[in-house]
Design a protein with these regions (language model features):
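Short-chain dehydrogenase/reductase
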Residues: 1-100, 114, 124-125, 217-218
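Short C-terminal tail/terminal secondary-structure segment
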Residues: 1-2, 166, 244, 255-256, ...
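Substrate-binding pocket helix/loop in short-chain dehydrogenase/reductase
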Residues: 117-118, 125-130, 236
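Active-site helix of classical SDR
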Residues: 141, 177, 185
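Alpha-helical segment proximal to the catalytic Tyr-Lys
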Residues: 146, 190-191, 264
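Residue(s) in the substrate-gating loop at a strand-loop-helix junction
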Residues: 161
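Short, small/polar-rich loop/turn modules that mediate ligand/substrate recognition or access, typified
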Residues: 193, 198, 266-268
Length: 279
């Protein structure tokens, strides 16, 4: 028998049509939560910049994810969402509230990366990385936080990265944005502590997602390697302590645990899940 410890709760998951976001949405649904997923999709691809690694699942992924959520006997909502747009975030939040009445759980899984040296980093690309990875969570938190405080319940989990703790060549904007997300996480946690609202960050290492595999393609091109993506992934995995990539569901399991009542004392934390690797 499944543990429906989130029955009656409503979760909003950004980046929820693929990767870690989708895995998290399904985990929360299995735990009994109604789930609203938002995601940038292929028809919105025009918003991406040159050299930006952004995975945009096909538009049908929203309907497919919605159906998989609903199969767990909970309410499901799936709509396009651009976390860089105030209008898009506002529209999605209003739709979720109209459907479910409130948002109890927020998981910020939407993200994007770019590979550029600082000396030739386009300003527009820098600002986009900050906007997606830091301002995006700020926008969604700002919408949900007042209601959580008013109802005296909330769980916020931001998917950051091991990049928040280390520096990496050609990843200055991504590392800066994810480090900033840790700062935002801690401040939200302190402001919510007296109101039964927790806020944590999860720092994954290498995860087997389409976005990560797209990043591998970029690394191959930058290094001028004549190898397949599969071979590059094999070499990366070989350098990791557990010799493998994480499954998205492993990250989702951690996030779902942080949404338990028993986990309320865990707040303002940045929890690394990287198989013993620093990156």
């Amino acid at each position: 028998m499944q543990d429906r410890y989130l029955a009656g709760r409503t979760a909003w998951v950004t980046g929820g049509a693929s990767g870690m976001g989708r895995a998290t949405a399904l985990r929360l649904a299995r735990a009994g939560a109604n789930v609203a997923v938002g995601s940038l999709v292929e028809s919105q691809r025009a918003v991406a910049l040159e050299d930006q690694n952004v995975h945009t699942p096909p538009d049908k992924a929203l309907a497919e994810t919605r159906a998989e959520i609903a199969a767990h006997g909970v309410g499901a909502l799936a709509l396009p969402l651009d976390v860089c747009s105030d209008t898009s975030v506002d529209t999605f939040y209003r739709s979720a509230v109209a459907e479910f009445g409130h948002v109890d759980i927020l998981v910020n899984a939407a993200g994007s990366s770019a590979r550029k040296l600082i000396i030739d980093h386009p300003d527009a690309l820098w600002h986009r990385m900050i906007d997606v990875n830091l301002n995006g969570p700020y926008r969604t938190i700002k919408r949900c936080f007042p209601g959580m405080i008013e109802r005296r319940y909330g769980r916020i989990v931001n998917i950051a990265s091991t990049a928040a703790n280390v520096g990496y060549v050609r990843h200055s904007a991504y590392c800066a944005a994810k480090a900033g997300l840790l700062g935002l996480t801690r401040c939200v946690a302190l402001e919510g502590a007296a109101h039964n609202v927790s806020c944590n960050a999860v720092n994954p290492g290498w995860v087997a997602t389409d976005s990560n595999f797209s990043a591998c393609e970029q690394e191959i091109a930058i290094a001028g390697l004549d190898i397949s993506v599969e071979e590059y992934r094999r070499r990366v995995a070989e350098d990791l302590p557990q010799k493998r990539f994480l499954d998205p569901d492993e990250v989702a399991a951690l996030i779902a645990f942080l949404c338990r009542d028993e986990a309320f004392g865990i707040t303002a934390e940045a929890i690394t899940i990287a198989m013993g690797s620093h990156w």
